[in-house]
């Protein structure tokens, strides 16, 4: 990969001597996004936060980094070892909090706050604005007492269970290992 010491020389040499080799894949590699999620991530390039990311067989509680190409950071690099093209990944943006419960509780104690006012305790402002544009744009100017409990539950659930399908990985160019 891009560290300078790695090359395909060993594999080429093994093939010349008819030695068996295993197929290689880029590993510990950032994931790319397309469409609206590419634009979303690109606008947030440099924003990082602790998350829990998973595929059905494995998950990691580490930092996630939004990049101009998609997603990176320790959680995504680890997950890339288990993810397969076309599969969805799940991202819990606040793994230590049930955000539906947080929003419903805040509605009782601070009914004049907005969704972003409550969630600003957990997320950077830029991320909150981007999430709002995707998931609750019609509620941007609403206070909690104006929002139905079911809507708050859905928003909280989305934040704890964001599912998306990466378009690929950055491949061998940025892979840490093969």
Where are the model-predicted features located?
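Generic low-polarity alpha-helical segments
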Residues: 1, 14, 93-97, 103, ...
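Short, flexible micro-motifs
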Residues: 1, 7-8, 73-76
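Short hydrophobic core segments
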Residues: 1-5, 13-15, 64-69
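Glycine-rich beta-alpha-beta "Rossmann" dinucleotide-binding loop(s) and their flanking helix/strand
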Residues: 5-25
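An anion/pyrophosphate-binding glycine-rich loop and adjacent beta-alpha core
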Residues: 19-25, 29-150
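A glycine-rich dinucleotide-binding beta-alpha-beta segment and adjacent secondary-structure elements
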Residues: 133-178
């Amino acid at each position: 990969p891009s560290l300078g010491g790695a090359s395909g020389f060993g594999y080429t040499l093994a093939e010349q001597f008819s030695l068996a080799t295993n197929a290689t894949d880029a590993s510990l590699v950032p994931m790319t996004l397309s469409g609206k999620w590419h634009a979303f991530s690109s606008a947030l390039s440099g924003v990082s936060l602790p998350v829990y990311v998973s595929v059905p067989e494995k998950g990691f509680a580490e930092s996630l980094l939004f990049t101009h190409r998609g997603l990176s950071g320790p959680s995504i690099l680890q997950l890339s070892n288990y993810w397969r093209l076309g599969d969805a990944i799940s991202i819990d943006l606040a793994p230590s909090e049930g955000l539906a419960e947080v929003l419903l509780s805040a509605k009782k104690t601070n009914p004049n706050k907005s969704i972003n006012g409550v969630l600003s305790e957990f997320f950077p402002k830029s991320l909150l604005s981007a999430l709002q544009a995707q998931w609750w744009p019609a509620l941007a100017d609403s206070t909690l007492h104006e929002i139905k409990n079911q809507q708050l539950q859905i928003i909280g659930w989305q934040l704890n269970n964001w599912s998306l399908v990466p378009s690929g990985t950055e491949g061998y160019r940025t892979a840490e290992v093969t």
